[in-house]
Amino acid sequence: MEALVYTFLLVSTLGIIFFAIFFREPPKVPDRGGK
């Protein structure tokens, strides 16, 4: 049960950090004519 909790915390933390960096800096991926 603890493994599931730790995994959830790890994934959520990485997600928050990823979105924070992603929204702080504009994405540097070339736009191929589509959203």
UniProtKB/Swiss-Prot annotation:
Pfam families referenced in this protein's UniProt entry, alphabetically: PsbT
InterPro entries: PSII_PsbT, PSII_PsbT_sf
Species assigned in the record: Cryptomeria japonica
Keyword Thylakoid: yes
Annotated family: Belongs to the PsbT family.
Name assigned to this protein: Photosystem II reaction center protein T
Intracellular or extracellular location(s): Plastid, Chloroplast thylakoid membrane
One GO biological process term: photosynthesis
Subunit structure: PSII is composed of 1 copy each of membrane proteins PsbA, PsbB, PsbC, PsbD, PsbE, PsbF, PsbH, PsbI, PsbJ, PsbK, PsbL, PsbM, PsbT, PsbY, PsbZ, Psb30/Ycf12, at least 3 peripheral proteins of the oxygen-evolving complex and a large number of cofactors. It forms dimeric complexes.
TM ranges: 3-23
Family matches, as SUPFAM superfamilies: Photosystem II reaction center protein T, PsbT
Keyword terms, alphabetized: Chloroplast, Membrane, Photosynthesis, Photosystem II, Plastid, Thylakoid, Transmembrane, Transmembrane helix
Gene name of this polypeptide: psbT
Principal location: plastid
Function: Found at the monomer-monomer interface of the photosystem II (PS II) dimer, plays a role in assembly and dimerization of PSII. PSII is a light-driven water plastoquinone oxidoreductase, using light energy to abstract electrons from H(2)O, generating a proton gradient subsequently used for ATP formation.
Domain of life, source organism: Eukaryota
